Amino acid sequence: MACPNWRVRLAARIIRGGGVIAYPTEGVFGLGCDPGRKAAIERILQLKGRSISKGFILIAADFVQLQSYLLPLTASTRSRLEVTWPGPVTWLLPARGDVPPWLRGRYDTLAVRVTAHPLAACLCRTLGHALVSTSANRAGRPPAQTTLQVRRSFGSSLDYILPGITGKRAGPSEIRDGRTGQRLR
């Protein structure tokens, strides 16, 4: 189901066209694009000054949008996820072999999250698939928490900034290892 918010529909159209946007998440603004658009991923890497070896987070409106990227999960792993989703917890889960290295970096896992942020979830629903998510900041700088901070950091180098307010979380999402449950960030 698509979102009635015209700004979300505009953001989705830009992403489908290969664009890069900024949008609010649970704790900070994120930079996002279509996970299948390598040129858009490369643009984000250039904007942030980030290495491709780190990989990216994919956010989604629901787990179904993430399944095509992941190996089948055990019942106990699924249970761990369900307790934290939707929400600000990102899980590192075993990636399928055909997941491109520009998404997973140098790892055999992929960082995924079912977002609890209403605009971000609405954007994923409107797109009909998961969205690349990385904090809106240049390497070594703090993540943007407002539209104004995004504009100051990136100027006109983004195709669109989806206006909105971040969630109540202070800072980026927590990251956990899906195999062990261990908190990594």
Curated annotation (Swiss-Prot):
tRNA processing keyword on record: yes
EC number: 2.7.7.87
InterPro entries, alphabetized: DHBP_synth_RibB-like_a/b_dom, Sua5-like_dom, TC-AMP_synthase, TC-AMP_synthase_SUA5
Leader peptide range in chain numbering: none
Gene Ontology BP annotations: regulation of translational fidelity; tRNA threonylcarbamoyladenosine modification
Subcellular location(s) of the protein: Cytoplasm
Residue ranges of domain YrdC-like in the record: 5-185
GO cellular component, one term: cytoplasm
Domain of life: Bacteria
Protein's job: Required for the formation of a threonylcarbamoyl group on adenosine at position 37 (t(6)A37) in tRNAs that read codons beginning with adenine. Catalyzes the conversion of L-threonine, HCO(3)(-)/CO(2) and ATP to give threonylcarbamoyl-AMP (TC-AMP) as the acyladenylate intermediate, with the release of diphosphate.
Protein name per its UniProtKB record: Threonylcarbamoyl-AMP synthase
